[in-house]
Amino acid sequence: MKPEELKGKVASVIGAGKSGVSAAGLLARAGARPFLSEFGAVSPEAAATLRQLGVPFEEGGHSERVFEAALCIVSPGIPQTVPVIREMHARGIPVVSEIELASWFCPARIIGITGTDGKTTTATLLHRICAAEGERKGFRAFSVGNIGIPFSSEVPGMTAADIAVLELSSYQLEACFDFRPNIAVLTNVTPDHMDRYGGSIEAYATAKYRIHARQGAGDTLIYNHDDPILRAHFDRSEPWPFRLVRLGLRAETLDVAPGDFVSVEDGEIVVRASGSTERLMRVDEIMKPGFRGEHNLYNALSSVAAALAAGVAPETMRGVLAGFGGVEHRQELAGNACGLNWINDSKATSVNALRQALQSVPAGMVLIAGGRDKGNDYSAIADLVREKVACIVAIGESRRKIADAFRGVTPVVEAASLAEAVELARQNARPGASVLFSPACSSFDMFRDFEDRGRQFKQLVRELT
């Protein structure tokens, strides 16, 4: 839809979180007539913003008024299966996401990043690369989306010269229909959010694939060729309508087929584009205590591939990659206390993210895990846990499930709070060992979000010292 088509139209916004309030503001500035409806309570901050914008709203349920609309914008935390959204569909009212809405207004080049793991790190690193290039060439880079800043709040300040780096969750992509990123990145697909997708990895992957549904000539799709689900999806005989760039950790596995790729050979990042190969920099120039492990090498390759597709100079990438120290709450060293190394990996909200953390931390660790379960299957990491973990401290709503899953694999103790978990970890850890806080679950049972969870963990570690 074109922005001018919204003028004078009633648009219902479902959900009063950051993205919902920002979407309402964008609609109001476009001359539409937004109405926001929140099933729960609207926060005082959101209510004040809506009043300032002149946007009417309701809370404590959805009235008939929400259906008196030409368009519905749904917040990412609201499934398509809830009654209000099902009724929207039944009445023929188009339902789109805040990402879709904001994209109608976006003059900037869009780089979209999705996947089960690595989205935030890749988006953060890529944004820093693009921002550094922008300082040289006179454009701005914006970091928006699932990273915490609504796309719709920033899009009014963008120009055609700028780059918008979007971290995109499956929830945000579900209701995207005309969204067309110039460059799309798929980091990996492993089971996650199975509670939302009825236990179907296929349904979850389908939501992720919406990132390239509207891509065409002139666009680029970058994917992890080492991921079996993505490889099966993209390796087909008929050509895709967009440029395809593969990435992987072994150049020899990619060099057997034509096409562009980014990989590693003899300890160096290598890039093949338009038939020629270039060596960018050594891997050991990138890896450091806050940015280590195979998964972060994939994140670096994804960022390099996307930056090259956006026309960023290799020297800009080298400078940013050499100085990048990682992202908060992602295998972040929280401190050394009581003779132990405490690692904050609060962003690990899936089993695969936990697997990556376990592979990066020395054996003999104590693992603190648990939270609100998302349909997790822990059997796939049982052997790795047996090899690497001396004791698990299970917390949150899923603590009993975790205890049952690892019974006979490694000792498990349960904690009623994060503070108790930290104390139990201290008691059960051997001198010099690591304590890894990698929940593999969402945070909403005990915390506001994963950031709140990670900061509370770091505060508890500071108190130990």
From Swiss-Prot:
Print the keywords alphabetically. ATP-binding, Cell cycle, Cell division, Cell shape, Cell wall biogenesis/degradation, Cytoplasm, Ligase, Nucleotide-binding, Peptidoglycan synthesis
Gene3D superfamilies for this protein: Mur ligase, C-terminal domain (3.90.190.20), Mur-like, catalytic domain (3.40.1190.10), NAD(P)-binding Rossmann-like Domain (3.40.50.720)
Q: Which residues form the signal peptide?
A: none
Q: Name one GO biological process term.
A: regulation of cell shape
* InterPro entries (alphabetical): Mur-like_cat_sf, Mur_ligase_C, Mur_ligase_C_dom_sf, Mur_ligase_cen, MurD
Keyword Cell cycle tagged: yes
Q: What class of enzyme is it?
A: ligase
Binding residue positions for ATP: G115, T116, D117, G118, K119, T120, T121
Which Gene Ontology terms of cellular component type are present?
Answer: cytoplasm
Q: Which GO terms describe its molecular function?
A: ATP binding; UDP-N-acetylmuramoylalanine-D-glutamate ligase activity
What name appears for this protein in its UniProt entry?
UDP-N-acetylmuramoylalanine--D-glutamate ligase
- Protein species of origin: Chlorobaculum tepidum (strain ATCC 49652 / DSM 12025 / NBRC 103806 / TLS)
